[in-house]
C-alpha cells in the first residue's frame, strides 16, 4: 500500500508542477496506468490558464481524509509537506525552511514564516505536533514544540530516514480538527482545508468531479492554472 501511495503521490506531484508552472504547448497524457491521471489543458508558460481538467480512475466517494485516493489526490494539491523530493529524488525543505540533525535521533525543523491555512490562519509547529499525535504517525518519536516556527522529532534510536517519511506526511490545522472525534466521518468542507497551492472547492459525486482553485496567498505564489477539475472515470477504457 505504501508503494502505491508513493507512486500516486509522485504522479500528482508531477501534475501539480504542470499546474503551477504550466507546461509548454497543449499536451495529453495517454498512459494506461489504471490510477494515473490524464491531463488536458496544459498551456503556454506566459499565460494564466483558466482551467485544467484531469481524468483519473481513482475511487473517490467521500472527501474524508481517511479515504485513501482522496487523501493522495487532494493532499498533493492542497497541502505542503515539511519535506519534498525534487526531480532528482533529493530531499529538500518545503514547508520547512530547514531541517537538521546531529545524531539521527533528534531532528529539528524550522518552519517557513508566512505559510497560512486556506482560511487565513497561520501554520505553526503546534499543528505539526497535533497531526502527528492525532494520527499516531510517528509512534517512536516524541514531538516537541520549541516555538511557533520550530518543532523537534525526538527518538531514542537513530533513524536517518525520517525526512523521507515526512514527504508524505500531510499536516492538519489543529483549530479545525481538535474537536473531531472520527476522522473517517468528518466530511465537512473544512476537512479539506490545507496550506498548499490549491483550495478544495467542491465534490460533485453525481457528476463524478472534484474542483480545486488556486490559493491566492500561497507562499510560493499563485499557480498559473486558476482552476483544476478532476473527473472520475470507472476504468481506463472510458478515461482515454
Regions found by a protein language model. Name each.
Residues 100, 137-180, 197, 204:
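Surface-exposed binding/hinge segments that line
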Residues 1-52, 90, 136, 142, ...:
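Short, low-complexity disordered leader/linker segments with a strong preference
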Residues 55-102, 193:
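N-terminal lobe/hinge region of extracytoplasmic solute-binding protein
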Residues 97-136, 146, 152:
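Aromatic- and charge-enriched surface segment that lines or borders ligand/interaction sites
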Residues 48-61, 106-110, 128, 151-153, ...:
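Short, well-ordered beta-strand elements
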Residues 86, 90, 168-223, 227, ...:
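Gly/Pro-rich hinge or "lid" segments in bacterial periplasmic/extracellular proteins
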Residues 148, 229-240:
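Short helix-initiation/N-cap motifs at beta->coil->alpha
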